[in-house]
Structures are given as C-alpha cells and as structure tokens.
Amino acid sequence: MRAVVQRVSQASVTISDNIVAQIEKGLLVFLGISKIDQVSDISWMADKIVNLRIFEDDQNKMNRSLLDIMGDMIVVSQFTLYGDCRKGRRPSFTDSATPEKAKVLYDNFLSYLKEKYPINVQQGEFQAHMKVNIVNDGPVTLLLDSQKLF
C-alpha cells in the first residue's frame, strides 16, 4: 500500500462538476493498493498517516499530528502510484491490485479511519474521473509504503 500525503490548507474533489469532498486544514491522501497488499497493511498505513507530526507547533516546528490539530482528511484512490516507468515510455500497472481487490481494501481503509479516529474523513469516488484541487501548505508532501520500500 502506498500513499502520497500532502499537508493542505484546503482541498476538494470534483466529479462531473459536483464537489464530492471538501476540507480546510488537514491532509489529502492519494492511496494506491498493490496486488500483494493485505488487510494488515490498513492499520499500519492509517495509523502512520494520522499520527505523522507534520503540522507546526507554536515554535514553527513540525511537531503536531492531524489528531493534535483535529484536522480533516480526504482520501483518493490512485492506482497509478504503482505505475512502473523503468522501461519504455508507457507506465506498467502490473503491480496494482485488481479493481475488485483494491475497492475492498480502499473501503476498509476508510472504515478503519472513520471508526478509530475522531476526525472528518472524506473521500473521492473509487474508479471515477476526478478533479482534485489542492492548496499544498508548505509545501509538505510525503511518500509512504507499507512494504517500507521507501
């Protein structure tokens, strides 16, 4: 499971001219599911993201988590995080999970966050063409991988 985590001052997701998710201060998370991911990856990834100390404290040090600031989160499924561009010019997505498997893990990831944490979690629509509007705050962008490849 991979995530691109962006600290945002605001973000929104639009599908067919309808805003389906919108937040102020918080995190926008692009989440990719691989063919080897399992349910056990969900808790590691969700707990890591929510507890990352990437928000500034009173001394302007990144020392506060999403929970500390009671920020919001948007999660957007993005299979392209497993695009392999090492050969040729067209990415290969053979490491991405099948849509059926990815949907189950994506939904379970969202449920885990919503059940465990007292934060506003919103989401994009799985397999939809979305327009994601982001005001990256910092900018702060982090890459996470449940297999700890980076």
Curated annotation (Swiss-Prot):
Gene3D superfamilies recorded: D-tyrosyl-tRNA(Tyr) deacylase
Gene: dtd
Catalytic reaction equation(s): glycyl-tRNA(Ala) + H2O = tRNA(Ala) + glycine + H(+); a D-aminoacyl-tRNA + H2O = a tRNA + a D-alpha-amino acid + H(+)
Enzyme Commission no: 3.1.1.96
Full protein name: D-aminoacyl-tRNA deacylase
Entries under InterPro entries matching the protein: Daa-tRNA_deacyls_DTD, DTD-like_sf
A GO CC annotation given for this chain: cytoplasm
Localization in the cell: Cytoplasm
GO terms classed as biological process: D-amino acid catabolic process
Subunit structure: Homodimer.
Short sequence motif named Gly-cisPro motif, important for rejection of L-amino acids, residue ranges: 138-139
Family: Belongs to the DTD family.
Record remark on domains: A Gly-cisPro motif from one monomer fits into the active site of the other monomer to allow specific chiral rejection of L-amino acids.
Pfam families: Tyr_Deacylase (PF02580)
Biological function: An aminoacyl-tRNA editing enzyme that deacylates mischarged D-aminoacyl-tRNAs. Also deacylates mischarged glycyl-tRNA(Ala), protecting cells against glycine mischarging by AlaRS. Acts via tRNA-based rather than protein-based catalysis; rejects L-amino acids rather than detecting D-amino acids in the active site. By recycling D-aminoacyl-tRNA to D-amino acids and free tRNA molecules, this enzyme counteracts the toxicity associated with the formation of D-aminoacyl-tRNA entities in vivo and helps enforce protein L-homochirality.
Top-level division of the source organism's lineage: Bacteria
GO terms, molecular function: D-tyrosyl-tRNA(Tyr) deacylase activity; Gly-tRNA(Ala) deacylase activity; Ser(Gly)-tRNA(Ala) hydrolase activity; tRNA binding
Keyword field: Cytoplasm, Hydrolase, RNA-binding, tRNA-binding
